[in-house]
Amino acid sequence: MESEEVDNKFTWVIKNFSTLQYDKIYSDPFVIGGCKWHLLAYPKGNKFNNSLSLYLVVDDARALPCGWRRYAQFSLTIINQLTDKLSQRGEKQNWFNQRNLGSGFTSMIPLPNLHAKNAGYLVNGEVKIVVEINDLEVIGKLDVSEESEETNQPLKKIKLDDNDAVSFDSLNETSPVKESIDVNGFQVLPSQVESVKCIFERHPDFASKFRPKNRHLKSTYMTVLLGLIKTLCQLPEELTDDDLDEASVAVSYVENGGLRLDWLEKKLAEVKAKKKKVETGKARLQRAEEELQKLNQKCLELKAFLEKENADVSEANVPLSFEDVV
C-alpha cells in the first residue's frame, strides 16, 4: 500500500485490492491539522451490505489526554481513475472523542461497481482513496506540535494550553488566517455571516439562554449548528441512517449549551420522515416495475398466442375447391 500526504489531504493507494485476504485494512497514520489519523476500510464489505465501508479514525487515541475532543468536517472520495466526474465522494462533520473514535460511511460504493471491468475504480489492481479535512477544531493537546509540522494548512484549531485554558491558534504563522466577524456575540467566518444573520432573524431568541461565554467555544457551537443545517439541506436519499443518528446527537450537544433548537428538531424529524417516505416509495416503485415487467412479458406472450391463433384460424377458414371435393 502507498500513501501521500499533501496539505489537508491524504491519498491512500491500496494495491492488489482484488486479492486482499483481510476483512478490514488500515492506512498508514497521517497528520492533518496537528492531529494523527488513519483510514479504515472493509474491502469485502461489512456484515450489513455488499459495499465498501470506509472510515476516518483517530490514531493512537490512548496517547491523548483525558477529555480530548475533535470536531472535523471532512470528505472521503473513491477516485475514478478514468474520469473525476464518476468519483464517489461523501461528506461528513463529526465530533470525535474517546467513545467515538471514527466516522465514515458503511456504504461508500457497491462492491460490484467497484470491481466492474473498465469502471475506473480498480485500475491495475489499485484503488485510490482521498480524505480531505476542511475544518478542524481540537480540544485537548495536539498530537504533533506546530513547529514539527511541514505543511501549511488553513485549519481552525481550539486547544487546551498547559493550564487547561482555551486558546485559539492558526496552524502556523504562514497559514492564511480568516478574519472572524461578530454576529450577535458569535465570532464567525465571513462565509458564515449571512447564514448566522438569517438564523437570528428567523429565531431571535434561540441563543437567549446560551451559557458558554468563551468566544471560541461559542464559535464551536455555531459551527456545529451550521453543519447540522448543511446536513439537513441534502437530498433525503443521500442521507444515511448514520448521518441522521449523528445529527440527533449533535442537536442534543448544542441544546446542552443552552441553544433553543425546537425549530431544528422539527426539521430533523421532517427530513427523517421524508427519507423514510423516499425509501418506502422506492421500494413500491421497484415492486411496481417488477410487476410491470411481468405484465409486459405476459402481453408479449398473449400477443404471440393471438398471432398463432389468427394464423390457425386463417388456415382453417379456407373453402374447399371443386377439385378438393371431387
From Swiss-Prot:
A Pfam family per the record: MATH_2
SMART domains recorded: MATH
Taxonomy, superkingdom: Eukaryota
Ranges for domain MATH: 7-133
InterPro entries assigned to the protein according to its UniProt record, in alphabetical order: MATH-CC_domain_protein, MATH/TRAF_dom, TRAF-like
The entry's keywords: Coiled coil
Coiled-coil regions listed: 259-312
Gene3D superfamilies registered for this protein in UniProt: Apoptosis, Tumor Necrosis Factor Receptor Associated Protein 2, Chain A (2.60.210.10)
Name of the protein described by the UniProt record: MATH domain and coiled-coil domain-containing protein At3g58370
